[in-house]
Amino acid sequence: MSAIIDVYAREVLDSRGNPTVEVEVYTEDGGFGRALVPSGASTGEYEAVELRDGDKNRYLGKGVLKAVENVNEIIAPEIIGLEVADQVAIDRKLIELDGTENKSKLGANAILGVSLAVARAAADELGLPLYQYLGGFNAKTLPVPMMNILNGGAHADNNVDIQEFMIMPVGAESFREALRMGAEIFHSLKAVLKAKGYNTAVGDEGGFAPNLKSNEEALQTIIEAIEKAGYKPGEQVMLAMDVASSELYNKEDGKYHLEGEGVVKTSEEMVAWYEELVSKYPIISIEDGLDENDWEGHKLLTERLGKKVQLVGDDLFVTNTKKLAEGIEKGVGNSILIKVNQIGTLTETFDAIEMAKRAGYTAVVSHRSGETEDSTIADIAVATNAGQIKTGAPSRTDRVAKYNQLLRIEDELGHTAIYQGIRSFYNLKK
């Protein structure tokens, strides 16, 4: 393997029309890697910091020229000459250069762009697909897609409180079949919503964003769409929710304000509500059911539902091994959402996935609401045999780019490809 000879960053746009960072890395022996950095709408308090310029005269203050400059002026001179294959050493160098706990000096968007582009350049130099370069020849498990087909909360301008209602085609025999099932249900949902007189505009992640009467109506409508598409809810297709409760939590009164429904709930009442929903609908996964700082609430939720429902920590764990270790020790949750830009380097991302698996927690590799055509997370999902991926509806190119990459990977793997379906939920006690 050869050394890095050039690193270059530029400002480009993400799927929401906001600026983001793109990084290119070149090696001595002709390796080339390009990576684009995603951005979240509902962000965790403890996430690595995304550097924005704050100049209101440019992109309403959301420019990333400072992050781009940090790559070109500070990071590039330090990593040019380093061995491109030494991902851990390069990521360690990036962390040292920044010197802060949350990557606020150089920006997680600058650091991540470099980290991912380095991996792509190394894979390119070796002539290997990225998933195989990162995961070796054991990388062959295709993830079950967690498809966000109905949006609310911070991802849509409507009166639905829960941020994401998702389907998981666990009964499929292959990823290709799972994607087809998801797409058919998505189109079926559009027809169901139209028949009810609801809007079929889509939100940030490609799901529909109608003004429904209640959060429960969203679940009922999706069940109707699954059946209309010819599938069996609870057998072939399960439901998942991302509540994004930190967006509902009021710090002043310590309660959850479901404004769409006009109700206020305590932590205990939220847990009781989830128990009721799980008893009525085939819900297999709940993400961020309580506020990121409501550890007692999360512990109660885990005690009540942790054996039969995947309880995913997103804002709770922020892809951070310190936060995850605390959760494991306290018996909170049984799954972690993996977002590369929450932590900022590929090495730290892999560390979080490894820690989760060792503790019997699942790892769900995830996009952000502000995405790009970059499909790296598809390769990461296969490289780590994560078993689950959350990357939006089968709609909008920024989401479909990941699904199409997984189709390519499944084709490349041929008969060695594995689609585990319901077996991906090894954290649940049957």
Curated annotation (Swiss-Prot):
Signal peptide (from-to): none
Short name of one Pfam family: Enolase_C
Principal location listed in the UniProt entry: cytoplasm
Cofactor note: Binds a second Mg(2+) ion via substrate during catalysis.
Recorded coiled-coil stretches: none
Record GO terms (molecular function): magnesium ion binding; phosphopyruvate hydratase activity
Keyword Transmembrane helix: no
Entry binding sites for Mg(2+): D242, E287, D314
Any one GO BP annotation for this protein: glycolytic process
Function as written in the Swiss-Prot or TrEMBL entry: Catalyzes the reversible conversion of 2-phosphoglycerate (2-PG) into phosphoenolpyruvate (PEP). It is essential for the degradation of carbohydrates via glycolysis.
Family: Belongs to the enolase family.
Listed name of the protein: Enolase
UniProt gene name: eno
